[in-house]
């Protein structure tokens, strides 16, 4: 089953979900490691091998980050076109509202983190290229230290929002699985059977438009 139903996530949604999750758990440690290398090089200097390793780590980080960006945009477009399976806790209005906000905060940060990183990359030059054939610069971004500094800071802020929303998202999934003992987590995995419908909730399109308005 490729598409969503009122009670089940389809294979395409699951592939988007787990591809993005895998990318997140790669890109964040790479960013931390790259920053640590950069700070060590700035503070103490380094040989050519260490500089080359830092450039490799940052290039990998940027390339995975842009892959996540375009995958997240495709995921959002797919969600708009699909019915959203009804929440298994739809009768718990406050909990359901909080889970929805965390979910779309997560997706908003999945867009904003790589976009701000991309702008920062475009405002600088000569270090750690993105591994793709489409060029390194955005046409509207000047080469500017102040622009680079601004978007570097925003990149860090949104990265922290991403981490916080990710932790809350995982905690909510575990709460459903361990405490509520419902199928919320299982139905996002492959090969699980559909569950019965629950109380009515807002569509994916409404949630996305609300998130974009924020």
List where the protein language model places each region.
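Membrane-embedded alpha-helical bundles that constitute the cytochrome b-like, heme-associated redox core
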Residues: 1-214
């Amino acid at each position: 089953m490729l598409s969503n139903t009122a009670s089940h996530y389809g294979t395409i949604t699951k592939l988007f979900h787990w591809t993005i999750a895998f990318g997140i758990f790669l890109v964040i440690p790479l960013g931390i490691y790259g920053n640590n290398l950069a700070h060590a090089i700035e503070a103490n200097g380094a040989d050519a091998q260490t500089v080359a390793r830092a450039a490799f780590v940052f290039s990998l980080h940027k390339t995975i980050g842009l892959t996540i960006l375009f995958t997240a945009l495709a995921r959002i477009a797919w969600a708009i076109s699909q019915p959203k399976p009804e929440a298994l806790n739809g009768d718990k209005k406050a909990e359901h509202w909080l889970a929805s906000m965390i979910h779309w905060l997560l997706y908003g940060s999945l867009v904003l983190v790589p976009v701000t990183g991309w702008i920062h990359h475009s405002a600088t030059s000569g270090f750690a290229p993105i591994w793709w054939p489409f060029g390194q610069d955005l046409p509207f971004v000047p080469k500017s230290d102040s622009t680079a500094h601004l978007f570097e800071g925003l990149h860090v802020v949104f990265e922290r929002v991403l981490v916080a929303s990710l932790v809350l998202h995982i905690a909510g999934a575990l709460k459903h699985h361990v405490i509520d003992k419902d199928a919320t987590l299982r139905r996002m995995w492959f090969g699980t059977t559909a569950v019965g419908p629950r109380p009515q909730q807002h569509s994916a399109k409404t949630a996305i438009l609300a998130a974009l308005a924020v």
